Every structure is written in structure tokens, then in C-alpha cells.
């Protein structure tokens, strides 16, 4: 399966002063990151994804309202961290309160307070005043605030990159001693030392700034193990590995780039969708949408109609002519049947049965008449006209027989054969009648058979005539088209002959010019080679010199003297190279360094070392998914593309089988076609057969092939709609942000007011332990780790102060001092009362009047 990566154009050249060169980048990848070109290594930073994550963590307000909660939770985290540091210092100061109590309070001062509560408040305010004075002298609040900012910065780096990078100083392993200010008292020294431990750790460990991370840091991942190095500086990077606590998911595999990086794609999509929805709404307010169906153009329709009317009978004309011929044939057949009946009746009444010779002759004429009638019927197909009179005469010649039986009887002599009867006898007459009746029956049957044969022949001839007519029509159309094509070809041949004549002349002319140019180019190449060799020009500079020489005008007619021509050429060289002294090695090195900082050079190194930058859209594996995701891209420098390196090429060749992807335009029928703005399905595509028919139609008509005569008829159209962005994208993204906050900040459960309003979720003690415990372990030095009970007390104090509406009451610092010194204050009050009882001898001082006196 293919992988998708993001390579912003010239990512490494975004570094100051031109960035790192391609060769140095390759050496750095091999030396510090273990690149061999045989195992794929993933580039975590700098990539488009990591840069966007850092931008979101630094400026969450410009992304979306969901990201604003990030500032809220980080601010609350800092407040709890600084409060815990104060509580930790006060816990350390508790043993010092004994000296503080004896030196600060006098027994006789108790006499000035009428109530014990007043004395307690006085002692509390004294403690607060003394601690605040020490804090002011040491600058504790400002120093702890800076430490809190560094703590929040470390958390931000972890959320964006998965860990917190640092650059240790040269004296990292050198022991450093604390030198307090001699004017500090014991309390101030404790506070100063507490801050100094964190400050020393930050100074020696060197937490990287945002600018250094963006411009001077490279992070790779190889089989779940991350490698970190600087790009431009020589110092190696030692990561401040909060991973054991900060990254509670365990080993960082490539699928878990960073939790914030998984939100970046959805944020980009939401921003794009909101802008597109706004643009679509504004467009709908100012534009009318009309659905049309484009049909055959008027010019094409008129041309086709005129051609078919003038040269070719339409289908309607053919049907009408065939109908007329059929009616005419029916009338003719009916007329022939009537005349045949009349002729048969006349023959039976007028014929003489005794005129045998005449009867035989008439039979012969009858056969001849039938043959002649068949010939006339055949001619009827061509002339489509049959003369009724001629047909009647032919029929009368057959049936009007005049038989003279008396003459036949008179001429009969001799003996009669056996079985014969004498003509004129009773038996002869009866036999003659029977014979006549048989002949009449046979004659009728013969005529009916001949009539059926003639009718069938007539129908067959009609069909043949129609087929021949259609064939002749097609031949006429083809002939006319061929005649037009021949005329057009003749004209084209004539034009081609004329063009060939001109081309031959041009070729001869160009051939002479080319020969001259070849000679000039040979001389120029020799001159350029000599100049390049003497000036020590690089290959790129040689190309630029050749381009400059090609762009210069011919100096053959230039009247300037030789010295002025040399000055002009020198000026051109200065403009080209910036200095005439091109032999300087620094200039050559500078030009070569620029070539090593191009986008192509970086891409070649990454592909050769099989370093694959993380994609902007995590989880995109195929080109189709990438194309759909890239629709949401809002910046040109976000360039997702398919991985193309040696490892992927080898894996691709090892995969058996072949995946066939049908994209738009690859099939002959173009059933589905897509582009960036529209997708449609053609239910009646132009197939090869249809294209061949269209080509034949173009050849037979006067419509030229480039003219568009077929247009799509749109059946259904679905326009872009303004969808519910909040339902489709807003709510899922908000849920993802809630999961991110709950996972990384350990928030409390949702709290609702009595009226049902949801309150902002707050941090818990687990939130501070999650990040603060490991931070104290690495940065705190000799300071003890975080105590859960102390954290709970701090969280309760901070939460109680945040819930108080009256802002006139004391803040977190004063409340924290009184809370932490509650027991020492109570012990101080009791100690003063005990001392007063010993002096006065009164057991119940509070109920006596001595305080009032």
C-alpha cells in the first residue's frame, strides 16, 4: 500500500542565512539519525504538520474557538504550579517559625487585645507581612512566575512534538555553588535557594526557544525510537525527556505522531468548509441558477433538412409511395379477376364441342396469351400502367371459340375405333358433353394455378423493386458524398502541391542558413569554452553565459570600435555575475552552495536516504484519498504526494497482482467523467460504433466533422448545497478537542449549576501530578518531589479562591500563608497566653477583666 508524505517546498531552506545545504543534510541524517537508505525513517520535524502544531500551540485564538480552551487550561496549570511552589517553600520555612515567634511577639502585647480572635488575626497578618517582605526582597514572585512560564512552555512543546527538546550548556557537568546575598535573613535565604535550584537547571539544561525549534531542530523516528539533532549549530541536542510522565501512552510509534497533530487536519477542513459555505451563501444571494437542456443547433438542423429534402427521400415519402403502389396493385388484381370470370362464362356459352381442330388452335392461343400476359405483368413493374383493353382482347382470343360441329360430322368417314361413338349419335353427344365438362374443369383449374403464380410473381417483383429502389437511393447518396470528397481532395491536393513547392524553397533556404549557423556556433562554443576555462566558471555559470550570448544582438553591423565593444561585453558580464573578477574562489563556492539549497536538492537527499516526512492528513494511504483530502488544502506550500524512494520501489515490485484504476477518460465510452468542480454519468455514451456512424454521416452530408451536432440532455442535476457544517464537522471536532483536554489535563467531570448551566471544567490534582512530578524530578535538583497531600491542599485553596465572588478578600498568596502557618499561629497564641498566665497568676485570662483594664 502506498504511503503519503508532506514535503513543503524547501522546508530546510526556511532556516536563517539560506539554511542547511543538501550535502550537509545528508551527512547529518547518516551521522546523527542512522539513515542508511535501506530502512524507511520518518521525519517528524520540520514538516508542515509539526509547524502547524507549533503555530496552534502558540496562537490558539486564531484557529478556532475550540483551541481557546488550551490557553485557559495552561493558565490554570501555571496558577496551580506557582501556588504549589509557594506552599512548598512555606513548608520548608515551618521549622524557622520558632525563632520568628520568640523574637517578634511580646507577652505584654496580649494585653492590647480584648478578644482571642483579634490576637489571632494580628499574628496572622504579622506572619503574612513578614513573608511578603521576604518575598519582595528576594523577588520570589517574579522568579517563580518565570519558572512557571518555562514549565508551561515545556508542556506546550510536549503537546506539539511529543517531547521537550533542550540544548545543554558547556558547563552542564560542572558543579555550581550557591552564593546567597549576605544581607538576606534565614527566610530570604531559603526562598532564594529554592528559586536558584530551578534557575540553575534551566540555565544548564537550555530549554530551546520556539524560534530555535522552528529553524534549528530536526526530529526523526526509526522503528519507534526518536533521534534529535540541531541543523545549523554544532551542539548536539539532549532532549528533556518528559516522555516517561508526559507521554503516558508509552513508546512513540509513527501512528502516534502527537495528539495535537491529529487535530490539525480537521481544523484545516473546518476553516475551509466555513469559508466555502460563506462564499456559497453570498453567491446564492446574488446569482440566479437556470437549468437548461441543449439540443441540436439550428444551423445543423437546417443544413441536414435541406440536404435530405433535395437529394434523398425521407422515410415518410418512402412509406407514402409504397402505400400508393399497394393500392394500385390491389385495384389491378381485382379488375383482372372480374375480366377472367367474364371470359370463362363467354367461352362456356359460345364454344362448339364438335369443332375439335378449332378447339386445339384456340387452346394453343390460350397458352400463348397466358405467356404474353405474364410478360405484360412483368413490364407493369417498370411502367406501373396496364392497358385494360389489351388485356381484355388477349382474354377474348382465348375463350371466344367457334366450333362447327356439323362440318366435323360431315368430314368424318371410315370405321370408328373401339369404344368410340358416332358423332351425332345419342351416346356420342352424351360423351361429348362429359368431355367438354372435364375440359372446362381442367381449364378452370389451370387458370387458377396460373393466376396464383402470377400474383406471387407480382408480389416478388414489387419487393425486388422496393429493395432496388432503396439500394439505388443509398448509392446515389454515397455517390454524391464521394463526388464532394473527390472535389475536396482535388482542391487539397492542389493546395498541398503549392505548399510543398514553398516548403522546398524554405528548406533550401534554411539549409543554407543552418550551415552558416553551424559554423558560427562552432566558433562561439570554442570561444565560450576558452572563456569558461580561464574564468573557472561552474556548469551553471556556463549555461548562463551561453544564454547571454544567445540573447545578444548581432554585432556585425555595429559601428562601435573594438574597445567600446569590449566595454559593452564587460558590462554584460558584470551584470551577469555581480563582479568582473569571476576567478575568485569564494564566488564559485557561493554559486555551488546556492545550487545545494534548492528544493530539488533536498528532495533528492530525502528520497536517497528514504526519509519520509509526516503527511499533513494522518492516515491517508492511497492517491484517491490524497486527492479527496487535498481539496481542503488552504495553503500552496502544503504539498502532499505519494512516497517515491528506493524502499517503496522495491516493495512495489515484490507485490504480486496488479491493481487497475479506472480514471476519467481512460475508457472508450467515457461513462464517468470527473473534474474539480463537476462529475457526471453518461447513460448513452459515444461508443466506437456510434463514432463510426457519425463519421459516415459527416462524409455523406455537408456538415463538417468539427461542428458540434450532438449535445447532452441532462436528466438529473444536483447542485452544491450548504450543508450543516456544525453537525458534520463542528461537533466531531469539538468532541475530539474534549478528548484531547481530558486526556492531557485530567479534567474533572462536567459540573452543572442548579439551573442547568454547564461550568467550565477544572483541573484536578492528577493534572498537576501528571506534569509537575517529572518536572520537579529533573529540574528541582535537591528539592524533594511533589507531595500528593500538599497538592490537594493547594488545589483546594486555589479552587476556593477562584469560586469566591468578593474580590476584596485576600488573594492566593495571603491565603496560602495563613493556611500553611495555621498550626504555628495557633501555637504562638497559646504560648503567649501561657506566659501571661504565669506572670499574672490568673488561670482564665479570657474571662477576667485584666485585658480590658
UniProtKB/Swiss-Prot annotation:
Protein name, per record: Uncharacterized protein ORF28
Entry keywords, A to Z: Coiled coil
Species of origin: Ostreid herpesvirus 1 (isolate France) (OsHV-1)
Organism taxonomic ancestry: Viruses, Duplodnaviria, Heunggongvirae, Peploviricota, Herviviricetes
Parts forming coiled coils: 313-343, 480-528
Amino acid at each position: 500500500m502506498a504511503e503519503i508524505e508532506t514535503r513543503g517546498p524547501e522546508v530546510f531552506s526556511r532556516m536563517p542565512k539560506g539554511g542547511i545545504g543538501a550535502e550537509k543534510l545528508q551527512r547529518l541524517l547518516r551521522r546523527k539519525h542512522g539513515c542508511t537508505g535501506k530502512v524507511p525513517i520518518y521525519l517528524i520535524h520540520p514538516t508542515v504538520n509539526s509547524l502547524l502544531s507549533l503555530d496552534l500551540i502558540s496562537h490558539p485564538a486564531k484557529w478556532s474557538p475550540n483551541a481557546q480552551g488550551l490557553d485557559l487550561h495552561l493558565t490554570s496549570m501555571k496558577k496551580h504550579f506557582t501556588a504549589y511552589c509557594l506552599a512548598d517553600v512555606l513548608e520548608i520555612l515551618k521549622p524557622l517559625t520558632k525563632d520568628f515567634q520568640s523574637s517578634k511577639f511580646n507577652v505584654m502585647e496580649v494585653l492590647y487585645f480584648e478578644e482571642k480572635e483579634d490576637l489571632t488575626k494580628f499574628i496572622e497578618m504579622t506572619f503574612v507581612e513578614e513573608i511578603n517582605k521576604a518575598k519582595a526582597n528576594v523577588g520570589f514572585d517574579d522568579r517563580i512566575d518565570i519558572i512557571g512560564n518555562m514549565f508551561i512552555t515545556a508542556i506546550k512543546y510536549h503537546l506539539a512534538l511529543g517531547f521537550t527538546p533542550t540544548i545543554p550548556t558547556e558547563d552542564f557537568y560542572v558543579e555550581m555553588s550557591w552564593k546567597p546575598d549576605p544581607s538576606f535573613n534565614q527566610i530570604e535565604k531559603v526562598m532564594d535557594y529554592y528559586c536558584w535550584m530551578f534557575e540553575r537547571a534551566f540555565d544548564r539544561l537550555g530549554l530551546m526557544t520556539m524560534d530555535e525549534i522552528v529553524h534549528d531542530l530536526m526530529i526523526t523516528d526509526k522503528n519507534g525510537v526518536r533521534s534529535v539533532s540541531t541543523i545549523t549549530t554544532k551542539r548536539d541536542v539532549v532532549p528533556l525527556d518528559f516522555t516517561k510522565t508526559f507521554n503516558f501512552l508509552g513508546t512513540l510509534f509513527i501512528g502516534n505522531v502527537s495528539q495535537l497533530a491529529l487535530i490539525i487536519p480537521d481544523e484545516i477542513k473546518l476553516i475551509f468548509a466555513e469559508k466555502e459555505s460563506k462564499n456559497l451563501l453570498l453567491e446564492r444571494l446574488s446569482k440566479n441558477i437556470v437549468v437548461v437542456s441543449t439540443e441540436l443547433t439550428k444551423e445543423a438542423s437546417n443544413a441536414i433538412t435541406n440536404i435530405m429534402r433535395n437529394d434523398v427521400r425521407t422515410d415518410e415519402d418512402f412509406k407514402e409511395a409504397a402505400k400508393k403502389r399497394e393500392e394500385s396493385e390491389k385495384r389491378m388484381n381485382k379488375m383482372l379477376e372480374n375480366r377472367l370470370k367474364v371470359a370463362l362464362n363467354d367461352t362456356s356459352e359460345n364454344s362448339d364441342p364438335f369443332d375439335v381442330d378449332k378447339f386445339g388452335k384456340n387452346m394453343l392461343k390460350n397458352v400463348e396469351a397466358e405467356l404474353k400476359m405474364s410478360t405484360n405483368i412483368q413490364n407493369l413493374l417498370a411502367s406501373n400502367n396496364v392497358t385494360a383493353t389489351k388485356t381484355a382482347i388477349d382474354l377474348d382470343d382465348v375463350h371466344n371459340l367457334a366450333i362447327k360441329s356439323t362440318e366435323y360430322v360431315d368430314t368424318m368417314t371410315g370405321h370408328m375405333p373401339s369404344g368410340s361413338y358416332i358423332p351425332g349419335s345419342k351416346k356420342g353427344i352424351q360423351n361429348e358433353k362429359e368431355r367438354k365438362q372435364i375440359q372446362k374443369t381442367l381449364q378452370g383449374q389451370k387458370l387458377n394455378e396460373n393466376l396464383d403464380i402470377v400474383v406471387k410473381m407480382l408480389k416478388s417483383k414489387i419487393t425486388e423493386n422496393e429493395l432496388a429502389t432503396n439500394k439505388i437511393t443509398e448509392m446515389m447518396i454515397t455517390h454524391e458524398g464521394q463526388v464532394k470528397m473527390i472535389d475536396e481532395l482535388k482542391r487539397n491536393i492542389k493546395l498541398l502541391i503549392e505548399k510543398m513547392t514553398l516548403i522546398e524553397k524554405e528548406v533550401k533556404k534554411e539549409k543554407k542558413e543552418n550551415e552558416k549557423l553551424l559554423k558560427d556556433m562552432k566558433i562561439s562554443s570554442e570561444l565560450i569554452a576558452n572563456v569558461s576555462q580561464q574564468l573557472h566558471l561552474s556548469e551553471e555559470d556556463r549555461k548562463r553565459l551561453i544564454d547571454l550570448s544567445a540573447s545578444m544582438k548581432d554585432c556585425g553591423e555595429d559601428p562601435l570600435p573594438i574597445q567600446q565593444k569590449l566595454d559593452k561585453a564587460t558590462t554584460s558580464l558584470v551584470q551577469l555575475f555581480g563582479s568582473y573578477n569571476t576567478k575568485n574562489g569564494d564566488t564559485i563556492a557561493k554559486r555551488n552552495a546556492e545550487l545545494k539549497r534548492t528544493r530539488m536538492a533536498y528532495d533528492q537527499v530525502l528520497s536517497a536516504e528514504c526519509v519520509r516526512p509526516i503527511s499533513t492528513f494522518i492516515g491517508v494511504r492511497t492517491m484517491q484519498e490524497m486527492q479527496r483530502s487535498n481539496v481542503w488544502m488552504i495553503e500552496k506550500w502544503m504539498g502532499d504526494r505519494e512516497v517515491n524512494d528506493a524502499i517503496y520501489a522495491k516493495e512495489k515490485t515484490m507485490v504480486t497482482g496488479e491493481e487497475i484504476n479506472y480514471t476519467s477518460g481512460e475508457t472508450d465510452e467515457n461513462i464517468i467523467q470527473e473534474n474539480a468542480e463537476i462529475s457526471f454519468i453518461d447513460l448513452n455514451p459515444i461508443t466506437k460504433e456510434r463514432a463510426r456512424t457519425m463519421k459516415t454521416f459527416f462524409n455523406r452530408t455537408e456538415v463538417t466533422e468539427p461542428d458540434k451536432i450532438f449535445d447532452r440532455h441532462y436528466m438529473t442535476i444536483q447542485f452544491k448545497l450548504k450543508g450543516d457544517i456544525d453537525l458534520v464537522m463542528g461537533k466531531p471536532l469539538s468532541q475530539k478537542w474534549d478528548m484531547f483536554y481530558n486526556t492531557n489535563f485530567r479534567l474533572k467531570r462536567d459540573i452543572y449549576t442548579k439551573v442547568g448551566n454547564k461550568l467550565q471544567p477544572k483541573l484536578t490534582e492528577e493534572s498537576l501530578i501528571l506534569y509537575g512530578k517529572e518536572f520537579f524530578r529533573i529540574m528541582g535538583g535537591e528539592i524533594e518531589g511533589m507531595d500528593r497531600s500538599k497538592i490537594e491542599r493547594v488545589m483546594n485553596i486555589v479552587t476556593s479562591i477562584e469560586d469566591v465572588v468578593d474580590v476584596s478578600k485576600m488573594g492566593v498568596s495571603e491565603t496560602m500563608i495563613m493556611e500553611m502557618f495555621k498550626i504555628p499561629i495557633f501555637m504562638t497564641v497559646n504560648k503567649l497566653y501561657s506566659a501571661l498566665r504565669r506572670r499574672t497568676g490568673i488561670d482564665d485570662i479570657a474571662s477576667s477583666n485584666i485585658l480590658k483594664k
